[in-house]
Curated annotation (Swiss-Prot):
Gene it is expressed from: SWT21
Role this protein plays: Involved in mRNA splicing. Helps to stabilize the U1 snRNP-5' splice site interaction.
Keywords of this entry: mRNA processing, mRNA splicing, Nucleus
Record's keyword annotation contains Isomerase: no
Protein name from the UniProt record: Protein SWT21
InterPro entries: SWT21/TCAB1_mRNA_Telomere, WD40/YVTN_repeat-like_dom_sf, WD40_repeat_dom_sf
Family as reported in the entry's similarity comment: Belongs to the SWT21 family.
Domain of life from the UniProt record: Eukaryota
């Protein structure tokens, strides 16, 4: 990230280097609290103005099913970004928003005079999107002729998982859907997390400690893994939700997942059973929501709700956490999603427009020295984003050239920072 205004900041007992960062582009006041239909109309009119200014015909932005009816009701809601996905070539990004919108933004040159992010395309889901993941091959400019490459998976309550065509820039066009019904009661099992494993496979975490594995070309799961524990009376099934899957993307047959009961499991895709790696109950946290791997594959970084630390697990010594990253305060129900791409970054639970950062050497060692000494892991750098000083940074997603952040508070939006 470009850095300015260096100073020292006390963090607990250590002194961290602090920098101020200024976004070079953001959504500005687009998502400030106002009637939803006005937000949508503002985006559409801005898109039309840009088309005229640049002499380029941008796709017409899709309309919400509720756009006309909401004009009479004057419904005012915060529109918060729930997730961010970068395209494979980092030329565009997608956001999943609380107004059911799926927006694609083109990434401007930091040296240009464009400071406002406005959707290049916008489609609306029919219901609130709980989980999503973009095709690992998606690119707007180098798009494949194969529809599956230009798609996004979305999951919601009481409907099948959908693979949505991103070539259709203003309508929700489903390429295919995937069965998530429970054969015993014929009810849909909500997909709380979706992650691609390879280009042709994806995983879904759902209720009753269950992970489904899908081939993108088949409607039914090709494998299902569950977890149960032994009790004196036989097998007792935990009725917990698989809430997160690790962020790795490789041909490795082993993945990891976490539950809202603070359990972390090993997923061996060749088997049928989830293996318990660690139970993080007892630290006061209320459920895992993100798992990030170190590049060397040795350490897992587990983020939990209502926690003042990020637990570090070593899969070679799974009996207990080997260390933790210290946070300056306790998180709450809101998920602060981190990113690891050269450095490990997460928004501060205290808000104030702050980003906490740990360097690669800390993450790859788990904060353990060669002499096997455990080191306190306060952030190495504290980034301040003055434009967001009264807000909380909820999501951080980096590409090769830029860092995208989502923030909420007095207003909500997304912004781009140079790496």
């Amino acid at each position: 990230m470009n850095q300015a205004n260096v100073k020292n900041t006390t963090f607990h007992s250590m002194t961290s280097v602090s920098y101020n960062l200024s976004p070079y582009c953001s959504t500005g006041t687009t998502f400030r609290k106002q009637p939803l239909y006005r937000i949508w109309e503002t985006e559409s009119s801005t898109s039309a103005d840009l088309s005229q200014k640049l002499n380029y015909m941008f796709p017409k932005l899709g309309l919400s099913e509720s756009q006309t009816s909401l004009k009479d009701k004057d419904v005012t809601k915060d529109v918060v970004c729930q997730d961010i996905h970068w395209s494979v070539d980092a030329t565009s990004l997608f956001t999943i928003n609380s107004d059911y919108g799926i927006r694609q933004y083109l990434i401007p040159d930091p040296k240009s005079d464009q400071t406002l992010l406005n959707p290049y395309s916008r489609i609306f889901a029919h219901e609130s999107v709980l989980s999503s993941d973009i095709s690992p091959r998606y690119s707007l400019y180098e798009g494949s002729s194969e529809p599956l490459a230009n798609s996004i998976l979305i999951g919601a309550k009481n409907v099948p998982i959908k693979l949505v065509d991103l070539n259709d820039t203003n309508n929700l066009s489903t390429i295919r859907s995937y069965d998530i019904s429970n054969l015993e009661n014929e009810k849909f099992e909500t997909p709380y997390v979706l992650k691609y494993h390879r280009e042709s496979l994806f995983l879904s975490g759902t209720v009753r400690n269950k992970v489904n594995v899908y081939d993108v070309n088949r409607r039914e799961p090709v494998n299902t893994l569950t977890y149960s524990r032994r009790s004196k009376c036989g097998t007792q099934s935990y009725k917990s939700i698989i809430s997160c899957l690790d962020d790795s993307f490789s041909d490795n047959q082993v993945r990891y997942c976490g539950s809202y009961k603070n359990q972390v499991f090993i997923i061996d895709l060749r088997g049928k059973t989830l293996q318990l790696l660690n139970n993080l109950q007892g630290n006061g946290a209320r459920g895992c929501y993100q798992i990030i791997n170190s590049d060397n594959g040795s350490y897992l970084y587990v983020l939990q709700r209502y926690s003042s630390r990020i637990e570090i697990l070593d899969h070679r010594r799974p009996d207990r956490p080997v260390n933790h990253l210290e946070l300056p305060g306790r998180s709450d129900f809101q998920k602060l999603k981190a990113c690891y791409n050269g450095s490990f970054q997460v928004g501060s639970p205290l808000g104030k427009g702050q980003i906490l950062s740990w360097d690669k050497s800390t993450i790859e060692s788990g904060g353990i020295t060669r002499e096997n000494q455990v080191v306190q892991c306060q952030p190495d750098i504290l980034y301040n984003v003055p434009q967001c000083k009264s807000m909380r940074i909820n999501i951080i997603k980096t590409s090769s050239d830029a860092t995208a952040i989502s923030y909420s508070g007095d207003t909500a939006g997304i912004a781009l920072l140079q790496r």
